[in-house]
Structure formats: structure tokens, C-alpha cells
């Protein structure tokens, strides 16, 4: 069995309220991610992104990891781990530094980003991500990459995503109990955006909403930059609960009915379609019209989407007042397990009054039959995030080696200069042999 570290393999692990998913991806030379292992199992011990039964979570993680290892024929030692929950918060900050040389260096960029993130965050919270939005040099704004440009002062605008220390520790603890190392914690909504959005959508303005079992993770982009992140602690499970109460059926059966027969828009359901609904307490199952089922599902999905719409409208007003691009010309992208229900895009268009699409993972090869579903968007996004970290890590090593060689050559030149200076061989004192000697 090959160790994951022996090849360019990255592993993404999502521990959600409804499911635990583990994906193993191989980073190909062209930058594509080739999925070679998939593992998943129903989640136990999680609620709205938080751990409420550690032992149950550990068992679920182990089961998903075992499946992925078996399929990929590799030994997993570390993972990129998704994190969600209402404790996730965000803030946009600005930093400014003088430019040290004639032109901006990578060190200047790192300094200005460090200045921007050196702010007070909420008590018992820590910074999860620092994501640059844009830079400004003197009077020139909207710069994406300032390296090599000239100026006196540089400003950076960054988006900070923070999480509660203990919430993060608990989910990491569950993974470490399985003998795994966490390479990095990544906000689930950010991972999903890496998976389902195109560069054009980010540039035009888009909101991605990952609708899971316990939470809806939101990420809003305008002008190519991440402007806002939010977790709403209501999602697909409230729809399941409504079905269970409305028809007196066990929650597990209500979930199966929602997935197989559910529709978020009653007007597209045929009047003669019927659904068999199991009962509780040994009573015989009943038959009901699918239209009746849709009448329970549609109002709840509409309510959930309205919560997202309120968040978007508040953000757009704030961005407009700040003079920042606020239009979402690319509309809304819905993804996640609870986004797979029939009629959701049409239902959402009535709420958002803009174009809506259901987002599936992009830019992957390999086991796409398994992984190219909205259900796996976060896990695939973790692989893309891990790929970037791998490539950036290699570039950083190469940069350090180049810098080290450059420094060695500089020291050698300095030593040679001193030696030649001592012998009077520099600054025009170099002895010239007599022409006759050359003859």
C-alpha cells in the first residue's frame, strides 16, 4: 500500500451534520485533480457543524477514511478538514505599509497583509483565513498583484474568516483520534466556492450557497474578491423534520422521502403522482399525493432561501455605501446535499429574482461518477485547496533555494572583490603585461 505522502496526493475530509465524506485526489502535472478514492457514511454525533458526541464522530470518520484508503490503495496520514457552524464569522480589514525598495517585493506584500490581519477578533476566536481582496499603491487602486510595481505606500484590503477556538479543537480532536494529522482547517463555504465557481462568476459577482443538513454556508464574491462569508444554522434537516411531523413518519423515512420524491416547487408536480409514506408504531404505510408532499417542502425551502436573500441584501447595501462593487451579475449558485431536490432552481429564482444554477464540482477527473455531485462539493473543494497549497509550497521551496543560491553567489562575489582589492586588481589597477611579452 502506497503512503499518500509518496505521491502528490491530497485528502479532503468533510464531517457534516448529515454525512462524512473523504476524497483522495492525485495532483496531475496539468494541475487537474484526479480522484482515486471516495469514502462516505451517514454522520452521527454532529449538529449544525459542531461535535456533540465525540466517539460517534470518530467512528464515522474512521469508516469513511477506511473506504477511501481501500479504493485508492493508499495509506492516509493527513487531511484537509472542512469546518462550519454558526460560530464562523468574518470581517474586512485594511493594512498599509511603506514600500521598502524602488518596487514592490513579495516581502512587502506579506508585510502589508500581516498588518491588515493584525486586528482584534472576537473573544475566544482565532483567524482561520486571511484572503487578500485587492491592493492599492499610492493613488492607484484595484491592483490584483502589486509585485514589481513602483510607489511609496501600499495598502491591502483583506477578508478575515474567524472561528471559535473550542469548536475547531473538538473537530480536530475527532480526526486526530483516528491517527490522522490535520494539514489545515478550511471554512466549508470557501471550499465549496473553490469547487463549483468559475473565475468569470467571481469577477461578475456571485453568491454560492452550500445547503447541507444542519447549516447553509454562504460566500459572496464581487470584482473577483471574496467580500462576505456567513453560516446560517438552518438547512435541509428542518425540511426533513417538517415531513416527519406533517405525515407522522420516522425521521429516517422522512429523509428518504425528501430525497426520492421531494420537490421544492409544487406547480411542476403531476396531480396523479403518489408517494408511499411509512408510519410509526407498526401501523401500515399510507399513500399520499406527491403534490401534498410538495406543499410541505416548498414553503420551508422558500423560508430558508429568504434568510439567504436577507443576508445578501444587507451586504449589498453595505458594499454600495463603501463604493465597492455590489451587483451579483452571475446570480446565485446553490450546491450541497440539500440542493439536489427537484425544482429548487426555479423556487430560488422566485426568491432571488436573478439567475440561479445548481453547482456541481468542476475541474476533476477520475471517479467523477461518485464525486461530481453537489453532495461532494465541499470535499472536492478541499482537494482544490490542498492542490494550491502543494503547488505554492513547492514554489516557496524553489524560491528559498534560489534565494539561498543567490545569497551564496553574492557572498562569493563579495569575497572575490575583497581579495582582488587587496592585490590591487580592481578599480583600474590591474597590471598589463608588456606587448613584447605577448609577441
UniProtKB/Swiss-Prot annotation:
This protein's UniProt keywords: Cell cycle, Cell division, Cell inner membrane, Cell membrane, Membrane
Subcellular location(s) of the protein: Cell inner membrane
Coiled coil: none
Main localization (coarse): membrane
Lineage top rank: taxon: Bacteria
Listed NCBIfam families: ftsA, PRK09472.1
Assembly and interaction partners: Self-interacts. Interacts with FtsZ.
Record function comment: Cell division protein that is involved in the assembly of the Z ring. May serve as a membrane anchor for the Z ring.
Protein's recorded name: Cell division protein FtsA
Organism of provenance: Shigella flexneri
Gene: ftsA
Amino acid at each position: 500500500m502506497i503512503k499518500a505522502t509518496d505521491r502528490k496526493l491530497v485528502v479532503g475530509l468533510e464531517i457534516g451534520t448529515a454525512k462524512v465524506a473523504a476524497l483522495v485526489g492525485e495532483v496531475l502535472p496539468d494541475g487537474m485533480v484526479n480522484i482515486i478514492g471516495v469514502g462516505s457514511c451517514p454522520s452521527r454525533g454532529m449538529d449544525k457543524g459542531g461535535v456533540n458526541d465525540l466517539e460517534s464522530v470518530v467512528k464515522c470518520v474512521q469508516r469513511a477514511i477506511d473506504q477511501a484508503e481501500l479504493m485508492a490503495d493508499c495509506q492516509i496520514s493527513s487531511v484537509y478538514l472542512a469546518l462550519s457552524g454558526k460560530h464562523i464569522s468574518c470581517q474586512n480589514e485594511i493594512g498599509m505599509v511603506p514600500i521598502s525598495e524602488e518596487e514592490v517585493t513579495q516581502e512587502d506584500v506579506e508585510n502589508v497583509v500581516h498588518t491588515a490581519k493584525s486586528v482584534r477578533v472576537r473573544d475566544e476566536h482565532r483567524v482561520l483565513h486571511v484572503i487578500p481582496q485587492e491592493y492599492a499603491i499610492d493613488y492607484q487602486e484595484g491592483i490584483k498583484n502589486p509585485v514589481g510595481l513602483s510607489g511609496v505606500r501600499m495598502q491591502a484590503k483583506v477578508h478575515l474568516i474567524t472561528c471559535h477556538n473550542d469548536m475547531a479543537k473538538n473537530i480536530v480532536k475527532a480526526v486526530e483520534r483516528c491517527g490522522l494529522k490535520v494539514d489545515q482547517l478550511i471554512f466549508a463555504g470557501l471550499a465549496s466556492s473553490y469547487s463549483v465557481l468559475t473565475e468569470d462568476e467571481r469577477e461578475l459577482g456571485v453568491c454560492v450557497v452550500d445547503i447541507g443538513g444542519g447549516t447553509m454556508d454562504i460566500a459572496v464574491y464581487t470584482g473577483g474578491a471574496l467580500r462576505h462569508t456567513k453560516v446560517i444554522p438552518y438547512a435541509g434537516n428542518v425540511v426533513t423534520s417538517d415531513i416527519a411531523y406533517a405525515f407522522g413518519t420516522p425521521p429516517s423515512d422522512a429523509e428518504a422521502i425528501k430525497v426520492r420524491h421531494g420537490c421544492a416547487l409544487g406547480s411542476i408536480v403531476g396531480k396523479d403522482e403518489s408517494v408511499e409514506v411509512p408510519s410509526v408504531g407498526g401501523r401500515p404505510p399510507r399513500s399520499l399525493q406527491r403534490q401534498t408532499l410538495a406543499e410541505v417542502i416548498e414553503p420551508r425551502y422558500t423560508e430558508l432561501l429568504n434568510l439567504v436573500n436577507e443576508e445578501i441584501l444587507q451586504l449589498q447595501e453595505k458594499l454600495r455605501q463603501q463604493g465597492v462593487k455590489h451587483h451579483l451579475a452571475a446570480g446565485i449558485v446553490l450546491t450541497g446535499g440539500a440542493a439536489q431536490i427537484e425544482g429548487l432552481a426555479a423556487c430560488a429564482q422566485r426568491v432571488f429574482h436573478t439567475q440561479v444554477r445548481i453547482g456541481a464540482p468542476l475541474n476533476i477527473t477520475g471517479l467523477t461518477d461518485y464525486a461530481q455531485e453537489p453532495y461532494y462539493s465541499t470535499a472536492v473543494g478541499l482537494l482544490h485547496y490542498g492542490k494550491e497549497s502543494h503547488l505554492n509550497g513547492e514554489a516557496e521551496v524553489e524560491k528559498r533555494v534560489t534565494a539561498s543560491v543567490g545569497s551564496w553567489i553574492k557572498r562569493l562575489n563579495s569575497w572575490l572583490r575583497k581579495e582582488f582589492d587587496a592585490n590591487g586588481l580592481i578599480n583600474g589597477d590591474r597590471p598589463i603585461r608588456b606587448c613584447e611579452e605577448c609577441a
